[in-house]
Amino acid sequence: MTMSAEINLPFNTFTRAVATTCALIGCTLAMQSSHAGWFGATTTNSKDKLTLATWNLEWLMTPQARQALGATCMAQQPRSDQRALPCTPGRTPPPERTAADFDALARSAQALRQRDSVDVVALQEVDGPEAAKQVFRQGWRLDCFVQRQHPQKVGFAIRDGIPYRCNGDLQALDVDGGTRSGADVTLWPGTRQEVRLLAVHLKSGCFTGKLDRDFPPCAKLRQQVPVVEAWVDQRVREGVAFALLGDFNRHLDKDARYPAGPDEAAPFNLIQAWSDHNPPGAELLRATEGERYIGCDADDRHKQYIDDILIDRRLADRNANRRFARLSYEARDQGRTLSDHCPVIWSLRP
């Protein structure tokens, strides 16, 4: 476990005035959002707010690591205990980024901190703290990454000054030695603001349809669902506010319409398995519910979110005003090697 040495709670308030934003980021970042409950200025004490984000950074590595691993890549996807990259014939290799690419990603990270006052970002496909530093350059603690040799790791970027505790990996999510563990952190431990977060990057490939169909990715995802449910149920029993953040590799808007089925160990769908009121209080609210899809850039052809943030009833009850946003990439960076995902943000206020 890791405990932040910083025990004060300096919550900075950043103006949203256009002039200040221009000075910080050049007036080109494209923030698109839809709002529920509040918009613009507020008198809410900043200590009572919480802003969560999740961002899959698509094979984010240092240039040195990318070069070294690319020279000895494997024909198949490496397992969790293998320090290697795939070079599967017929598939696009992990990206190689230039300094300008990293700078563009860093501008998005800067906007998350300075303009949107994000407190914590759940990270996926990041090769640990050194890789994360390529993007999250100032004002963040990069920590609680899962213990995995594979370059695709899950972890957190936590705003400087927020006390936290790393709770260790949710290793059971790696159901076959090749899927990804979950990263688990507690913010403001031991205070009335305490909230526990689980960052996930679930098995890819089973985006829609029941999990019991004869398709290997669905079988793996089906094994992961009870692991998350057990984590959720334990937090409910403890009476701790919590959230799930990450890349679910699932169209949760469709998934949520259908029942989980009678067998908790072999569910048909995700959302109703986790949000089943068993134990009482096991109820989750989803950031993207009812939100139109906002593309990451002009080339984004997706229609639905797979990145999402889910909060429990306790956290929802103390934050009735919630704002969803998606941080799209700058138009001037069209064509750069950034990521096939961009940040999803959920701001919570009383």
Where are these regions (language model features)?
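Active-site His/acidic residue clusters
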Residues: A199-P217
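Metal-dependent phosphoester-hydrolase catalytic domains
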Residues: H35-N45, A230-A243, N249-P350
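N-terminal, active-site-proximal structural segment of metallo-dependent hydrolase catalytic domains
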Residues: H35-Q138, Q149, R332-R336, D340
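Bacterial N-terminal signal peptides
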Residues: A19-A30
